[in-house]
A protein has these predicted regions:
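Hydrophobic small-molecule pocket/channel-lining residues, especially in calycin-type beta-barrels
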Residues: 1-152
Length: 152
């Protein structure tokens, strides 16, 4: 089967860099808790001034959920995240070109230090997503998924 042509085209405006993520996506992976399935849905909300992410991680009998809002704060693309374990975080767009030239990257100061999440295009038309923590020698990747579009 031939590789699917990348649809990783950023849009216009301050939220335009998130255009490639709009829609519903799914990844399956192994984890310390066993097999997991994660779905991510990105959609424009509130007059297209914000993007909402709803993510659900399904681990066997359990689940972990996240709702995040992406928008502009003090002229900087930012996010505010809330999770089903009661935690919250917020961060801002950052440079992720060390991962991929077209990466979409956000950094956040977490209790354990600086962390980032990075999205970048996959050759099959989906995308990769990773979470990394800042260490002395650069970034330590501790989670990575490969997402495919969910057929609608």
């Amino acid at each position: 089967m031939a590789a699917k042509k990348s649809t990783w085209k950023k849009g216009r405006g301050k939220l335009g860099s998130l255009q490639p993520l709009l829609g519903s996506w799914e990844a399956e992976s192994d984890s310390p808790m066993g097999k997991l399935k994660c779905t991510r849905t990105f959609k424009l909300i509130l007059g297209d001034k914000y993007i909402e992410l709803y993510a659900r991680w399904q681990f066997g009998k359990g689940a972990y959920e996240e709702t995040a809002i992406y928008g502009i704060n003090d002229d900087v693309l930012s996010f505010w995240s809330f999770t089903s374990d009661g935690k919250k975080s917020q961060g801002y767009v950052a440079d992720g070109t060390d991962v991929h030239p077209d990466a979409i990257c956000f950094e956040a100061n977490m209790p354990a230090g600086l962390a980032r999440m990075v999205y970048w295009p996959a050759d099959d038309g989906g995308f990769h997503w990773a979470v990394e923590s800042k260490v002395k020698k650069g970034w330590n990747r501790f989670t990575m998924h490969h997402y495919h579009a969910i057929a609608t």
